[in-house]
From Swiss-Prot:
This is Potassium-transporting ATPase potassium-binding subunit. Belongs to the KdpA family. The lineage of its organism: Bacteria, Pseudomonadati, Pseudomonadota, Alphaproteobacteria, Rhodospirillales. The system is composed of three essential subunits: KdpA, KdpB and KdpC. One of its GO terms (molecular function) is P-type potassium transmembrane transporter activity. It comes from Rhodospirillum rubrum (strain ATCC 11170 / ATH 1.1.1 / DSM 467 / LMG 4362 / NCIMB 8255 / S1).
């Protein structure tokens, strides 16, 4: 790893650190109902939307009503997107004349975008029309991200309020997230991407004459607008099959830096929002520090592995002074590819600017571990922080047991009900990953979709189900996902991995909101210092990581050992 790579890492981390309090403070004002600068522009539109839809913005909801509103809204989005994909051939803005999407793929895709996963078992430019991309996918990119943030805000209110029966209004939180946060930032980002060279057009595909003769069809479309919210909302689904490795999605070094920053900006800012809304910014910075520590360690391992040559190439006498460049854009290099890979899986985004399948075994394991930990290292917008707060409750529970006190966090007692719900949310991901993956691979058609033998083939299949369950969406590209068993099983894993985690979180929020705040005493465990940060990271690694150690030992760890010994498969 050279000085240039170190400089890129430092610059990226410095930008995220600088944006965290700025975005965090702004979002705290938005979700507290305060007027902000954009209220002049969006205030009348917000009030008009409430009147049109019959929403009473001052009327708050019990956690169960909040959850029901969230489920109904997402079910409507799922059915609407599925219908768009199935009748695509009859809809406008389809210059390539693409037909209807197959039922199983349409189900998988609809679930993917509604759950903020953006798993893509298809090639965007060869499967979906402009209408499907804009009205179907891009709309869900906004509202699925807003759903995650709304759930987080409800949980924060549960910690901040005392003896309260309500958590806010889902429809208000959803609307304010889209209008005051996602839409303005996405609009500005889209303009910057157009300036940098990303297409934004409804015109036909272009016929080109390459130098080697013949003809070539160059796909275009409204790329910049989808790219902006794809990065900002931790969505990740690319307009093109190769995602942000495509020069139309990611044209320049500046666009690459902007898109990398967007991967973590909102998720990092929400830690500061949390601290402000509970009345103690130190709590937010403690969570930010824990996330940053795990992020930097993972990034260090990835850069170390990718900066060195592949041992198999060294044995063969092939010069690889630039590191492991397989599957990477030469214009971006190892450092940018490594930062993006770690950030996109830390952030539940899933977009890529390099092929994770071509990473060295241990480097490819880092993104997978980021997802296996529940994507709490910043995580998806909203989803990452409420996942982290589940681990926080487990941590203070363990700390309370060690000193013989009832666990507390922010003055709220963490009792049996909260712990049972927390354990449910922690058990859902491994059950989906290992269970659905094992069941799917009993089908010969599904097993045949794994294109590589040996431990790497196991890693490809495992990565797919980890990515789907964790609502990430990235993939090891040697895995042929568009077959019925995987479309069905990954679709179910995405649904369960999203909503069977959200529901316990909202139940916890309701339970905490109804409690009184216990005064701080001499025996209260401080949750803003280095001891707590270290204990929290330890709990995440032990509880989240050791669950998967056996299958990791059979996959990337075994592959690394074989590679170092000179054994190929």
């Amino acid at each position: 790893m050279d000085a240039n790579a170190i400089l890129q890492v430092v610059l990226f981390c410095a930008i995220i650190l600088g944006l965290t309090p700025l975005l965090g403070g702004y979002m705290a004002r938005v979700f507290s109902g305060e007027r902000v600068l954009l209220s002049v522009v969006f205030g009348p539109l917000e009030r008009g939307l409430y009147r049109l839809s019959g929403v009473r913005p001052k009327e708050e909801q019990h956690w169960a009503a909040y959850a029901l509103s969230m489920l109904v809204f997402n079910l409507a989005g799922l059915l609407g997107l599925y219908l768009i994909l199935r009748v695509q051939g009859w809809l406008p803005l389809n210059p390539a004349g693409l037909g209807a999407v197959a039922p199983d793929l349409a189900f998988n895709t609809a679930v993917s975008f509604v759950t903020n996963t953006n798993w893509q078992a298809y090639g965007g430019e060869s499967t979906l029309s402009y209408f499907s991309q804009m009205v179907g996918l891009t709309v869900q990119n906004f509202v699925s991200a807003a759903t995650g943030i709304a759930v987080l805000v409800a949980l924060i209110r549960g910690f901040a309020r005392r003896s309260a029966r309500t958590l806010g209004n889902f429809w208000v939180d959803l609307t304010r997230t889209v209008l005051y946060l996602l839409l303005p930032l996405a609009f500005v980002t889209a303009l910057v991407l157009v300036w940098q060279g990303a297409p934004q057009t409804l015109g036909d595909y272009v016929q080109a004459a390459p130098l080697e003769g013949g003809s070539q069809v160059i796909a275009l479309g409204p790329v910049a607008s989808q790219e902006a919210i794809k990065q900002l909302g931790s969505n990740g689904g690319g307009f093109f099959s190769v995602n942000s490795a495509h020069p139309f999605e990611n044209p320049t070094p500046l666009s690459n830096l902007i898109e990398m920053v967007l991967l973590l900006a909102v998720a990092a800012g929400l830690t500061n929002t949390f601290g402000r809304m509970v009345g103690d910014t130190r709590q937010g910075w403690a969570l930010f520090a824990a996330m940053s520590l795990m992020f930097v360690v993972g990034l260090g391992v990835t850069l170390w592995q990718e900066s060195a040559a592949n041992p198999a190439m060294v044995v063969a006498g092939i010069e690889a002074g630039g590191g492991n460049m397989e599957g990477k854009e030469v214009r971006l290099g190892v450092a940018n590819s490594a930062i993006w890979a770690v950030a996109t899986t830390a952030a539940s985004n899933g977009s890529v600017n390099a092929m994770h399948d071509s990473f060295m075994p241990l480097a490819g394991m880092v993104p997978m571990i980021n997802m296996m930990l529940g994507e709490v290292i910043f995580g998806g917008v909203g989803a990452g922080l409420y996942g982290m707060l589940i681990f926080v409750m487990v941590t203070v529970f363990i700390a309370g047991l060690m000193v013989g006190r009832t666990p507390e966090y922010l003055g709220k007692k963490i009792e049996a009900r909260e712990m049972k719900l927390a354990v449910i949310s922690l058990l859902v991901p491994p059950l989906c990953i290992l269970g659905f993956g094992a069941v799917a691979l009993t089908w010969p058609q599904a097993a045949a979709s794994v294109q590589d033998p040996g431990p790497h083939g196991l890693t490809e299949a495992l990565y797919a189900y980890v990515s789907g369950t964790a609502n990430n969406g990235s993939a090891f590209a040697g895995f042929a996902a568009n077959v019925f068993p995987h479309n069905l099983m990954i679709g179910l894993a995405m649904l369960i991995g999203r909503f069977l985690v959200i529901l316990p979180v909202l139940a916890i929020a309701g339970s905490l909101g109804a409690k009184k705040i216990v005064p701080v005493s001499a025996g209260t465990f401080p949750t803003h210092g280095g001891l707590f940060i270290g204990l929290l990271v330890g709990v995440i690694v032990v509880v989240g990581g050791l669950t998967y150690f056996p299958v990791l030992a059979l996959g990337p760890i075994l592959e690394q050992l074989m590679l170092r010994s000179g054994s190929l498969f």
